[in-house]
């Protein structure tokens, strides 16, 4: 009898808790609007993270979802002339191919329109702003994000977001932490509206050296620590060597490390070629990734695809793939399939979802 009473009491308590929760949820929805709180799996399954290609097949694979995630903050940093702006312009071009609206906040006042055009950027559709102060730049970003009409915003660069107080002050005045405070406030304001609007914001950043570091890495990025915490993906891009045609340097070999990734496993590395005036070499990636995936066979210095020899030496194989886009497309499809990624884009523009890793 006592056991039955205890079970009955526990049952009533559970019912009371359920009613209290239902009442609290109803009050929250009345106060903040329908959809302000819900059960994660209710009504519809969890949405797949939409991604935009980086223009590099190897980097898309390393990121785990086929590109950079939409509705998130991204940081791309590295030394000077390492390919940071080139990589972001490729992302802009890929987003424009899907019909997305892109904006470029050029705080450095150094964007080369002709180079952007060569990388596939549609200049007629690209929104560009060259703000005078850091506050103005971040207000422009905030306004564009809140509009819900922009799919991708690039800020080049965090180091050039100079606070108004520093610009109005004299040369040599100490402005301790003013840029870090500015970035911290901007991250707090932007992060919620970025998620709601599904707009990707890419911050390009520069590297500085810490003074007096004896052990460990002395490198750090500008703008304080806020961006490091709020960024879903952080990419470290480095130039590792030169590509030469006889005595002429025609490009760089570049390594990118996924330092932070909230949507897939981090710490993956990828190497690709950046050719001057051309950008990321897609054919070079197809040769290298094709060999790794077993799609392209390498015997000595010869490269073969199926029964067909495609070139002696890497540069000749690249030239063959440039001249034969159908073969290049077949190799690309097989590389993608071998990594379990569905890169196909449907009519709604949603693709690049992780299928099976």
From Swiss-Prot:
ATP binds at residues 78-85. PROSITE patterns: RECA_1, RECA_2, RECA_3. Belongs to the RecA family. This is Protein RecA. Can catalyze the hydrolysis of ATP in the presence of single-stranded DNA, the ATP-dependent uptake of single-stranded DNA by duplex DNA, and the ATP-dependent hybridization of homologous single-stranded DNAs. It interacts with LexA causing its activation and leading to its autocatalytic cleavage. CDD domains: RecA. GO terms for molecular function: ATP binding; ATP hydrolysis activity; ATP-dependent DNA damage sensor activity; damaged DNA binding; single-stranded DNA binding.
């Amino acid at each position: 009898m006592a056991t039955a009473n205890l079970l009955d009491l526990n049952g009533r308590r559970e019912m009371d808790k359920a009613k209290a929760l239902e009442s609290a949820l109803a009050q929250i929805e009345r106060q903040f609007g329908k959809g302000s709180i819900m059960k994660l799996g209710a009504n519809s399954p969890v949405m797949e993270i939409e991604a935009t290609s980086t223009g590099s097949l190897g980097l898309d694979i390393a990121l785990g979802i086929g590109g950079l995630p939409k509705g998130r903050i991204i940081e791309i940093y590295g030394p000077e002339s390492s390919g940071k702006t080139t990589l972001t312009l490729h992302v802009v071009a890929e987003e424009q191919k899907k019909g997305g609206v892109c904006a470029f906040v050029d705080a450095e006042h150094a964007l080369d329109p002709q180079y952007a055009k060569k990388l596939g950027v549609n200049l007629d559709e690209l929104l560009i702003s060259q703000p005078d102060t850091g506050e103005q730049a971040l207000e422009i970003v905030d306004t564009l994000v809140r509009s819900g009409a922009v799919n991708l915003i690039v800020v080049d660069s965090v180091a050039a977001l100079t606070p108004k107080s520093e610009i109005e002050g004299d040369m040599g005045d100490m402005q301790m932490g003013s840029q870090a405070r500015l970035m911290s406030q901007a991250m707090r304001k932007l992060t919620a509206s970025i998620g709601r609007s599904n707009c990707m914001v890419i911050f390009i950043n520069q590297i500085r050296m810490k003074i007096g570091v004896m052990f460990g890495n002395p490198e750090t990025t500008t703008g304080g620590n806020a961006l490091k915490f709020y960024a879903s993906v952080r990419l470290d891009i480095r130039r590792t060597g030169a590509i030469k045609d006889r005595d002429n340097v025609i490009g760089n070999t570049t390594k990118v490390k996924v330092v932070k990734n909230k949507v897939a496993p981090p710490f993956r590395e990828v190497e690709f070629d950046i050719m001057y005036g051309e950008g990321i070499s897609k054919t070079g990636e197809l040769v290298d990734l094709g060999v790794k995936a077993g799609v392209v066979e390498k015997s000595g210095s010869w490269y073969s695809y199926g029964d067909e020899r495609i070139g002696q030496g890497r540069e000749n194989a690249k030239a063959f793939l440039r001249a034969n886009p159908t073969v290049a497309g077949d190799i690309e499809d097989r590389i993608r399939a071998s990594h379990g990624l569905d890169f196909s884009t449907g009519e709604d523009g949603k693709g690049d979802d992780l299928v099976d890793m």
